Amino acid sequence: MDQSSILDFRSGTFFAPILVLYNNDLEKIEQRLQEKIASAPDFFSSSPVLFDLSELNENDKKIDVEALISLLRRLSLFPVGIRGGDPSQEKRALELSVPVDSGRSRNDAILPEIQRKDDTMPEVQPVIREAVRAPAMMITQPVRSGQRIYAASDLVILAQVSAGAEIMAEGNIHVYNTLRGRALAGVQGDTAARFFCLDLQAELVSIAGIYKTSEDLKETPKKKPVQVYLRDQALIIEELS
């Protein structure tokens, strides 16, 4: 048997909600999680989740990692990583088969300080290169429940996006029809990304990780064009005239 035909490793992008905790009261955490899950059951059911303890540890609020992991699993969430934990928390997480995530993005690299020995050396002018984004992806067919679409640029959809479908783009998203599924724009952290839709009835909309669920979108006008964008770390939904 050709050994190369058995398996292969391929690069890919994996998305998981990040659960940032500000309170270490497990009862309150469970209550709030139940509310969140009830507001978007299709999105959160059997969803992977990475939990971030950095805010708790910065404020000297300790939490029982084993109890937290048990709580998440009981609510049908699957912990896939711990971030911001202290050494003992990370050790316990690893013992429970939850890996440690460093939380450092490609933009967070720490560069060593460089001392220039000769202060008379001429300053090197930076070379400015314009970022080139891939052409927009266009979808003309309906996006059905269970389908997932990812665009490394802008995403333009001319047909309906059904409930249970998920569309994601590193740039802007345009849906020239009804959206009933989930839409995530700026998935690589582009806070300037926007979302445009002719009829917003979504289960969830997100820009750069900031999201609103269907529960938050109840007051959004139906069958009217809207745009969604970020302002001061909050999603703004604005009707287009």
From Swiss-Prot:
The keyword Cell division applies. Coiled coil: none annotated. InterPro entries: CAP/MinC_C (IPR016098), MinC (IPR013033), MinC_C_sf (IPR036145), MinC_N (IPR007874), Septum_form_inhib_MinC_C (IPR005526). Keywords: Cell cycle, Cell division, Septation. Pfam families: MinC_C, MinC_N. One of its GO terms (biological process) is cell morphogenesis. Interacts with MinD and FtsZ. NCBIfam families: minC. Cell division inhibitor that blocks the formation of polar Z ring septums. Rapidly oscillates between the poles of the cell to destabilize FtsZ filaments that have formed before they mature into polar Z rings. Prevents FtsZ polymerization. Belongs to the MinC family. This is Probable septum site-determining protein MinC. It comes from Nitrosomonas europaea (strain ATCC 19718 / CIP 103999 / KCTC 2705 / NBRC 14298).
